[in-house]
A protein has these predicted regions:
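Conserved Lys-Pro-Asp/Glu-containing loop-to-beta segment of HAD-superfamily phosphomonoesterases
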Residues: 17, 113-142
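Short hydrophobic segments within beta-strands
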Residues: 21, 84-86, 135
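Short, acidic loop-to-helix structural element flanking the phosphoryl-transfer center
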Residues: 44-45, 54-83, 91-96
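Acidic, Mg2+-coordinating phosphoryl-transfer loop and its flanking beta/alpha structural elements
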Residues: 130-167
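Short catalytic/ligand-binding loop motif for oxyanion handling, primarily in non-cytosolic enzymes
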Residues: 26-30, 35, 81, 90-94, ...
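A short, structured active-site edge motif that brings together acidic residues
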Residues: 82-90, 95, 99, 103-124
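Active-site neighborhood of HAD-like aspartate-dependent phosphohydrolases
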Residues: 7-57, 147, 157
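Charge-dense, intrinsically disordered terminal/linker segments
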Residues: 1-16, 25-27, 65-71, 75, ...
Length: 171
């Protein structure tokens, strides 16, 4: 006869893997960008804003946490959790900077960190035909993920995201 702990472990294994975005889910890209650009990111000249960001030493590594985002990390790291974040082709420092941020602020193993082009995110939607979960603030990523057979959580607020995870069986 199985005990409760064994049953909990089996059900934990049956849960999907979780893939979590970084920018505007875990770290505050827009706040960091506004600090170096001097105005809101969407309003700034496209080329000029990226020149300022790429010219700022450790821009990515020093981004602040989004309010409440540590709760998301605490919750998901009890399961098969991954980081799935797009790097910027407009800033050659974005990949290494994001890795620095993650190593400084989280305990994700290198094998569970996936820094990809945005269009590649949806290729992680399933593993061996089993759907994975994506937590992302960008609705286009969620729709592409779901179209590839994954389960999307459109992140707009920490309590909403945690409730969605709970609804899916993540306690």
């Amino acid at each position: 006869m199985r005990n409760l702990k064994d049953l909990l472990e089996v059900s934990k294994e049956d849960l999907p893997s979780i893939y979590c975005d970084m920018d505007m889910v875990l770290c505050d890209f827009l706040k960091g960008a506004e600090k170096v650009i001097g105005m809101p990111f969407p309003l700034a000249n496209k080329q000029g804003r990226w020149e300022k960001i790429s010219g700022t030493k450790d821009f990515w590594a020093n981004l602040e946490w989004m309010p409440g985002a540590k709760k998301i990390v605490q919750n998901i790291t009890r399961y098969d959790a991954h980081i799935l974040s797009a790097y910027s082709t407009k800033d050659p420092n974005s990949q290494s900077g994001k890795m620095k941020w993650l190593s400084k602020n989280t305990n994700f193993k290198r094998g569970n960190i996936h820094l990809v082009l945005r269009a590649q995110k949806a290729s992680f939607a399933q593993t061996d035909g089993k759907p994975n979960v994506l937590i992302d603030d960008y609705i286009k990523n969620i729709k592409e993920w779901e179209n590839k057979g994954g389960i999307g959580i459109h992140h707009t607020a920490v309590p909403k995201t945690l409730n969605e995870l709970k609804r899916l069986g993540f306690k």
